[in-house]
Design a protein with these regions (language model features):
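Conserved hydrophobic residues forming the short capping helix/wall of the S-adenosyl-L-methionine
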Residues: 104, 400, 535
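Short glycine-rich phosphate-binding loop at a beta-alpha junction
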Residues: 89, 384, 546
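Short Gly/Ser/Thr- and Asp/Glu-enriched loop/turn motifs at secondary-structure junctions
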Residues: 119, 414, 541-545
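Hard-cation-handling environments
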Residues: 197-327, 331-356, 360-516, 524, ...
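His/Asp/Glu-rich metal-coordinating catalytic cores
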Residues: 2-67, 72-284, 303-317, 336-340
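A glycine- and charged-residue-rich anion-binding loop/surface
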Residues: 13, 31, 37-44, 62-63, ...
Length: 552
């Protein structure tokens, strides 16, 4: 049997999101997490990004399962798209499993997938691997780290974590078990790097409840709170404070409604009698007696808060004096959309409270001192920083060395690298495909660089179409060409330019006729080249030019 453990990250290194790591030994392999990433602003029309799973498809008979650390989209968002191509069982904690089931139901995959529910402390076998779930703290309940026992030693994969000494529910991270594993001997540690640039400790989730209390007790108007739908700890805090001040709570936003339902069914949210109220009835109460909890903390265009801000919500209108609380920090790249929503709310007379001026949100990721504690407890032989942009991985690597890991045993890896570990060495030996796969609507991977280049071109300069009608008998023009533009100029205000473009097309056709050129591709090429040259010369713009020939 092979004596080398292979760890292959397909996503999550050098980036935020898209977390997917393969563990491989001999004939057995399994996945840890299967997340999506958010598209950059220049990925026009792309809804989300998932990892390239070519390597998994080439080794599908060796896959023993998928193990999920928690229910955030950057760790579960790609699951439906992977399961459409590969069949494998999923192992997760109860709340995480319930959230995954919601996603699979949307894709008609629920009844075709085996999901095994495990709790912290449970151990189970996947081929030659034994996996143990270890309770951690994070901004979503039921988060776990993994202790992965392999034939050559134990690997700890932290997932996203923080060390919260006063958690809202679920108890503290299981530091004793991590320390016990460290004393027994940890071969390698793969640890969350998201907050490595922040010194000190991450604030406790309990800090937020005092802020909510202050904002609720002095408000005589309606309160609207938006937060991450998956943050059931935060939802519980909002419900508790609303009950304290005798306000009814309504939930709006499909993802939040779904997660609230499953979290309540599983016992992760405790709702006092008479607090919740259907959104269809909440408008009948005085505004001073209501709280609306909604999606939209990232300014998402179809979210409940966005629709409220732009007067598109069917049940809620924003009135002057309404207090809107944004209890979330901006995911990088979402700042502009959030700012637009906040501006619109201010224009409607709402009082908007957000993270820049009030401590309404705390991170779910460990800061430097917590990362040091994880290293001190586990005492790994090898250390691989994960879950972060490249500078974060480098910073975390330095902390690893500071905490006593031999410099030669610290590896800053890249997506796709095959990391081979033995009892005596760790090195990146080769690589597998690990690029981005773009999801656009129902299409998976059908948007490539050429399509994105065209979309970028259209977005920047628009399109000019030249419709040319030629005779089937002699190949000569039957009518004047028609010029159609989109995103280039307003035609009614550029009639002279349209006339000049028709002239350019006619001259191009005449030139082709003189040269007895009948090949459509050549004619289109001539027309395109001449229009492009004329437009750049006269406007200094380079729209996409698309000649279309119709034969009659």
């Amino acid at each position: 049997m092979a004596s080398k453990l292979k760890i292959i990250p397909l996503g999550g290194l050098g980036e935020i999101g898209k977390n997917l790591t393969i563990y491989e030994y001999g004939k057995d392999m399994f996945l840890v997490d299967c997340g999506m990433g958010f598209p950059d602003q220049d990925l026009y029309g792309v809804d989300l990004v998932i990892p390239d799973i070519s390597y998994l498809k080439a080794n599908k008979n060796r896959i023993r399962g998928m193990v999920i650390t928690h229910g955030h989209e950057d760790h579960i968002g790609a699951i439906p798209y992977v399961l459409k191509q590969l069949d494998m069982p999923i192992y997760a904690t109860p709340l995480t499993a319930a959230i995954i089931e919601l996603r699979l139901e949307e894709h008609d995959l629920l009844y075709h997938t085996q999901i095994f529910t495990k709790k912290p402390g449970d151990k189970f076998k996947l081929g030659c691997f034994e996996i143990e779930f270890i309770h951690t703290n994070h901004s979503i309940a039921d988060s776990v780290a993994l202790a992965i026992k392999t034939p050559i030693g134990t690997v700890i994969h932290t997932g996203d974590f923080k060390i919260d000494l006063t958690p809202i529910q679920g108890g503290m991270i299981d530091l004793p078990r991590l320390g016990q594993l460290g004393n027994e001997g940890v071969l390698a540690l793969l640890s969350d790097s998201t907050n490595v640039e922040r010194p000190g400790y991450c604030a406790s989730e309990a800090r937020v409840i005092d802020c909510f209390d202050e904002l609720f007790k002095d408000c005589s108007k309606r309160i609207i709170v938006t937060t991450f739908a998956s943050n059931v700890h935060r939802l519980q805090q909002i419900i508790n404070v609303a009950a304290k001040y005798k306000r009814k709570v309504g939930i709006t936003g499909r993802s939040m409604e779904n997660i609230m339902r499953v979290a309540t069914e599983l016992g992760y949210v405790d709702i006092p009698d008479g607090v919740m109220m259907d959104m269809s009835q909440i408008g009948s109460l005085p505004r001073s007696k209501t709280v609306i909890v909604c999606t939209g903390s990232q300014g998402e265009p179809m979210s409940a808060l966005h629709r409220m801000a732009f007067s598109e919500h069917k049940q809620v209108t924003i009135d002057a004096g309404d207090r809107v609380i944004i209890s979330a920090s901006a995911i990088p790249g979402n700042e502009i959309t959030i700012s637009r929503v906040i501006d619109e709310l201010f224009q409607k007379g709402a009082e908007v409270i957000y993270d820049r001026n009030t401590p309404l949100h705390v991170s779910g990721h460990a800061c430097q001192e917590e990362l040091k504690m994880m290293l001190a407890l586990t005492k790994p032989l090898y250390f691989i920083p994960v879950h972060g942009e490249y500078r974060m991985l480098c910073k975390h690597a330095e902390i690893g060395k500071l905490m006593g890991v031999e410099p030669k045993n610290v590896l800053v890896a890249k997506n796709g690298e095959v990391i081979e570990i033995t009892k005596r060495s760790m090195r990146a030996t080769s690589s597998v495909p690990a690029g981005d796969v773009y999801i656009d609507g129902t299409g998976v991977g059908d948007v490539g660089s050429a399509v994105l280049r065209d979309r970028r071109h259209l977005a920047e300069d628009g399109i000019v179409m030249a419709i040319i009608t030629l005779s089937a008998e002699n190949g000569k023009p039957v009518t004047d060409p028609e010029i159609i533009t989109r995103g280039f100029v307003y035609v009614k205000e550029a009639e002279a330019l349209m006339g000049e473009l028709k002239r350019v097309v006619n001259e191009s056709l005449a030139s082709c006729e003189r040269q007895k050129q009948r090949d459509w591709a050549a004619i289109k090429g001539r027309v395109k080249s001449n229009i492009s040259g004329y437009l750049y010369k006269t406007t200094r713009r380079s729209p996409m030019v698309l000649p279309v020939i119709i034969e009659v």
